[in-house]
Amino acid sequence: AGHMQGKMIGDFLVANYDDVDLNGDGTISYAMMKGDEANIEAIYRTQYGVEDANAVLTAAGKPALAYFDAANPDCYQVDLGGAWSAAAAKDYMDTNFVSYNEDAGNMIELVICNNDGMAEGVIASLQEKGYNVAGAHVVPVFGVDATDNAKALIADGAMTGTVKQDADGMAAAISQTAAAVAEGKAPAEALGGLSDARFTIAGDCASKLFVAYAPYTGE
């Protein structure tokens, strides 16, 4: 999901760079909301959401993203309760706005979130400050999960994108595997016979299948 989110962010920024660069300094400043300190998925999403976005930016001749708070070596703000919560993300953004805003010339120009719940909290904070509402500047906010709330926020123009599990790919994997097992093949053999680019066999377990994520920016 982190890889998919990062590429989606990079592609969006390349297409909309000047609009996102609020202070016109040529670099996009970002905040990162991490769901949990130790969760491996949170770690990977935090890492690759930025790394893969930077890869796209670099390929397009653009500078890498700059974390908004140079005094924070972690380059993220984490839900200390490990709950991936909207409340934690909103609290962080409310606090960030005190020192980082348009008047000060150092506004956060992009927010990357480990999940859609945290994205909701960020958007609530932005909207209280007059952003991400009809007729106002939209700070791009990206999440993961493609929840119904996130889809509604995207439809309203308040959220830019999220990442969803490929439901069609999941259904195809189940159908093809079930058919192969019904023909007498062992599960590992059945999975190995799949020929869809949406599927990846786990390197450490021949009977484990990964189904690709897909970007979501609206219906």
Per-region residue spans from a language model:
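A residue-level marker of the well-folded mature domains of exported/periplasmic proteins
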Residues: 1-219
